[in-house]
From Swiss-Prot:
The modification Phosphoserine is found at S79, S93, S95. Phosphorylated on several residues by host. These phosphorylations regulate VPR activity for the nuclear import of the HIV-1 pre-integration complex. Residues 1-42 are annotated as: Homooligomerization. It is found in: Virion; Host nucleus; Host extracellular space. GO terms for biological process: DNA-templated transcription; monoatomic ion transmembrane transport; protein homooligomerization; regulation of DNA-templated transcription; symbiont entry into host cell; symbiont-mediated activation of host apoptosis; symbiont-mediated arrest of host cell cycle during G2/M transition; viral penetration into host nucleus. This is Protein Vpr. GO terms for cellular component: host cell; host cell nucleus; host extracellular space; virion component. Belongs to the HIV-1 VPR protein family.
Amino acid sequence: MERAPEDAGPQREPYNEWALELLEELKNEAVRHFPRIWLHGLGQHIYNTYGDTWEGVEAIIRILQQLLFIHYRIGCQHSRIGITPQRRRNGASRS
């Protein structure tokens, strides 16, 4: 008869602690790149939509991750991740 595998792996941090730590890190990074009034408006929108729930925490984490990714990708001056056209000495371009 089949049995569920025993939990032999290392103990994981509880999801809610991990989510709150991640949210704190994202907030700290977001205030370096976006106006506080925008972030406050986003927080108000999430609160008005989801209230004080884990669904709201997950939503704001997802939105902040997307905003920061796009911000870095389009060329944040604080980051090396952005798209920066590279100069070629011979003018050749890769396709």
